[in-house]
A protein has these predicted regions:
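Glycine-rich phosphate/pyrophosphate-binding loop regions near the starts of catalytic domains
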Residues: 1-113, 119, 124, 133
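Aromatic/hydrophobic pocket-lining residues that form π-stacking "cages" and hydrophobic walls in ligand
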Residues: 21, 57, 173, 197, ...
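Solvent-exposed alpha-helices and their adjacent loops that cap or buttress functional pockets
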Residues: 28, 61-62, 77-83, 102-106, ...
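Structural motif
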Residues: 32-34, 65-67, 83-89, 109-112, ...
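Active-site-proximal betaalpha loop/short-helix elements
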Residues: 42-44, 137-213
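Hydrophobic side chains in well-ordered alpha-helices
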Residues: 147, 229-232
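Helix N-cap motif at beta-to-alpha junctions
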Residues: 221-226
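Acidic, Ser/Thr/Pro-rich beta/coil linker or hinge segments at domain junctions
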Residues: 235-282
Length: 282
């Protein structure tokens, strides 16, 4: 994790490292158990900053119900590292019968987004460049494993779980479409994009669908299960704004595409982003 700045509204590099690894495991259908953490520290980093970050990691691990079982530190010369980098690894257990994978997306499934889109990326950019948007925004960083575990236990028939971090919602859905060989149709009117994110994105020439998120999960499951899944997800603070944003329309093989029905009723192709829109956001 190399996020810049290391402290920002809604979180810091410490809880981001824990939440990111926990969510990666949870989106495989696993119950996260143990994490390791390796720190690369720049010479001169204030010990108070390191202590603050480690305490943040401790709180995030406790909230997620995981243990940090090993760690290591290395110090490099000033200028060889920007303040602090963290490397984490995690181990979890996938319960019997769980089969979560991008290629499981099936025509007739719907796509549920667990919350507001674009908060983390815009918050980081604003804090880094002192743009002032952070007065209205904060990162959505959160661990989602407890909610996901309850979803899998209660609903059972969940086909795909993905956290739309780098590449955003668009990049993640394009990867799913290619892996499963299916077309995905989004409804622009249903996208939960906060007005502050929309305004900041327009000002900066960015598309919220390509902006990274750190407390969001995309859930793909049969439409018949959505009515049961949505109230369950909304019962958790981190997914209380869960909503259906699209559906899997047809099997398309190598021609799989992501499209969006716009507010004006026409259709737009949502391609993979070429290059990286915002570096060092996680």
């Amino acid at each position: 994790f190399v996020v810049d700045p290391i402290f920002y509204p809604g979180g810091d590099i410490g809880d981001l490292a824990i939440n990111g690894t926990v969510n990666d495991l949870a989106c495989c259908g696993a119950r996260p158990l143990y994490l390791t953490a390796g720190f690369i520290l720049e010479e001169g980093l204030p010990l108070a900053d390191l202590q603050r970050i480690v305490q943040s990691m401790k709180r995030a691990a406790e909230r997620a119900g995981v243990q940090i079982v090993a760690g290591d530190t290395k110090v490099v010369e000033r200028g060889k590292c920007d303040k602090l980098f963290i490397n984490t690894s995690g181990i979890g257990i996938v319960p019997p019968g769980i089969r979560i994978a991008p290629d499981q997306a099936t025509p007739g499934d719907v796509v549920i987004c667990s919350g507001p889109i674009g908060l983390h990326g815009i918050t980081i950019l604003s804090a880094r460049e002192s743009l002032g948007f952070e007065t209205d925004l904060k990162s959505d960083t959160a661990s989602l494993n407890i909610m996901i575990s309850e979803l899998l236990h209660t609903i059972g028939e969940v086909h795909v779980l993905r956290d739309p971090t780098r590449g955003g919602v668009s990049g993640t859905l394009n990867e799913i479409a290619q892996d499963a060989g299916v077309d995905i149709l989004l409804d622009e009117d249903a996208l939960p994009i906060p007005e502050a994110v929309r305004a900041a994105s327009e000002m900066l020439g960015l598309d919220p669908l390509y902006i990274a998120n750190e407390g969001l999960v995309l859930v793909i499951l049969p439409e018949s299960r959505a009515e049961q899944a949505l109230p369950l997800m909304r019962g958790f603070e981190e997914s209380r704004q869960a909503t259906v944003i699209g559906r899997i329309t047809k099997q398309s093989g190598e021609q799989a595409r992501v499209k969006m029905k716009t507010l004006y009723g026409n259709y737009r192709i949502i391609d993979m982003l070429s290059g990286e829109q915002l570096p060092r956001i996680c």
